[in-house]
Swiss-Prot record:
Its EC number is 1.3.-.-. A 2,3-bis-O-(geranylgeranyl)-sn-glycerol 1-phospholipid binds at residue 368. InterPro entries: DGGGPL_reductase (IPR023590), FAD/NAD-bd_sf (IPR036188), Geranylgeranyl_Rdtase_fam (IPR011777), Geranylgeranyl_reductase (IPR050407), GGR_cat (IPR054715). This is Digeranylgeranylglycerophospholipid reductase. The keyword Oxidoreductase applies. The lineage of its organism: Archaea, Methanobacteriati, Methanobacteriota, Methanomada group, Methanococci. Keywords: FAD, Flavoprotein, Lipid biosynthesis, Lipid metabolism, Oxidoreductase, Phospholipid biosynthesis, Phospholipid metabolism. GO terms for molecular function: flavin adenine dinucleotide binding; geranylgeranyl reductase activity; oxidoreductase activity, acting on the CH-CH group of donors, NAD or NADP as acceptor.
């Protein structure tokens, strides 16, 4: 059971949502697939706020074993406490238990025929005439596995893409430093609504409160700051904005991580390789959310891998189908989010308050272009920030 085969059609590195979706779709469509995960348990350690979009859109039933809360929208809260409510449209989804959810996706992939190797580290990959040799330390034993296609789903610090000459490394200004407590005894504004806080309390980022059943994820993401994310988070716990709501809060888990918010990498394919998920920058630069996008791009990568296997064509030209598909659907929205993020990072607390005072208190969807018109009409001094959106 432990031994790896000598060769596969597809080797996926990383068993997060992107990797598991890629391997599932490759196996389901006939490709002989290996999924490699460095942790001894898929789903650990958890490094994110655990919010996901509508799982039904992926053909996944939101099972109670991993769904902790249904989300119907969120509060955007300015430094002065003004709340803007966003509901409906694309705002609904779930907060999940990632330890269970990621394992569920991997089980699904295994049931489709994927071989899974946990506690396995890819030490390097080497290009061959017809694919890659993948060097794997699997439970202490060394293997060299041949494959026609590598799918790099190995996260924000991806080495696999770099081995293949695809530039995936991010600068410190492109990485959001995150810290989060999972806490009990937190009083939320609404148990089906997320809360987002902005301003100097979380430089170039935001603080979130996400309902999670009997607990709440209380976290922060900041960029290029003088203090640690944890220091800002601890200060927030006694902030007047949440006065009386966190007084009795008790942490039951602490998580840290990094989020790539600099936009997608320039190139996600080469001969015999595709890059997906955090490794590819498949994360909203504005929100830092990436699970849904990574899953969707994982589906595309797995499908193209299977198509490539059937066609016996593993060239960059063929695999570019994957890059074409994901860019057609997601590239423009990602670049818009990058533009919005760059604007948001320049705003002072006073300007954030002016924005909150300039827009309706209830929004069914966030159309930034239309909102920019309303904001500038009521607060002309903000034109310098928003003129490129008008």
């Amino acid at each position: 059971m432990r031994a790896l085969n000598d060769s596969y059609d597809v080797v996926v590195v990383g068993a997060g949502p992107a990797g598991s979706m890629a391997s599932y779709n490759a196996s389901k469509n006939g490709a002989k697939t290996l999924l490699i995960e460095k942790s001894q348990e898929i789903g650990t350690p958890v490094r994110c706020a655990e919010a996901v979009p509508r799982l039904e859109d992926f053909g996944i039933n939101p099972d109670p074993s991993f769904v902790r809360s249904y989300i119907k929208g969120g509060y955007l809260i300015a430094p002065n406490g003004k709340k803007v409510v966003v509901k409906g449209g694309k705002t609904d989804g779930y907060v999940v238990e990632r330890k269970v959810f990621d394992k569920f996706l991997a089980i699904r992939s295994g049931q489709a025929g994927t071989q899974i190797a946990v506690k396995s580290r890819v030490t390097k990959i080497e290009k061959t005439d017809d694919g890659y040799d993948v060097f794997v330390n699997y439970l202490g034993d060394e293997y060299i596995v041949k494959t026609k296609i590598v799918i790099a789903a190995d996260g924000v610090e991806s080495n696999i893409a770099e081995y293949a000459g695809l530039k995936s490394k991010k600068s410190s200004k492109e990485i959001c430093s995150c810290a989060e407590y999972e806490m009990t005894n937190v009083k939320l504004l609404d148990n089906e609504m997320m809360e987002f806080y902005f301003g100097d309390i979380c430089p170039k980022g935001y603080i979130w409160l996400f309902p999670k059943g009997d607990t709440v994820n209380v976290g922060i993401g900041i960029i290029d700051s003088k203090k640690r994310a944890l220091d800002y988070l601890d200060e927030f716990l006694t902030n007047p904005l949440v006065e009386g709501r966190l007084d009795n809060a008790v942490p039951i888990e602490f998580k840290v991580g990094g989020d790539p918010v600099g936009g997608p990498i320039e190139k996600t394919v080469a001969d015999n390789i595709m890059v997906v998920g955090d490794a590819a920058g498949h994360v909203s630069p504005l929100t830092g959310g990436g699970i849904g996008l990574s899953m969707a791009c994982g589906v595309m990568a797995g499908e193209v891998a299977a198509e490539s296997t059937k066609a016996e064509d593993y060239s960059e030209e063929f695999l570019n189908l994957y890059e074409k598909r994901w860019k057609e659907r997601y590239y423009k929205p990602l670049m818009k989010d990058l533009k919005y993020k760059n604007i948001l990072q320049k705003l002072s607390d006073e300007e954030l308050n002016a924005i909150a005072d300039s827009i309706p208190e209830n929004l069914e969807e966030v159309d930034v272009g239309k909102l920019a018109v309303k904001i500038v009409a009521k607060a002309p001094s903000l034109l310098r920030h928003f003129k490129e959106l008008l």
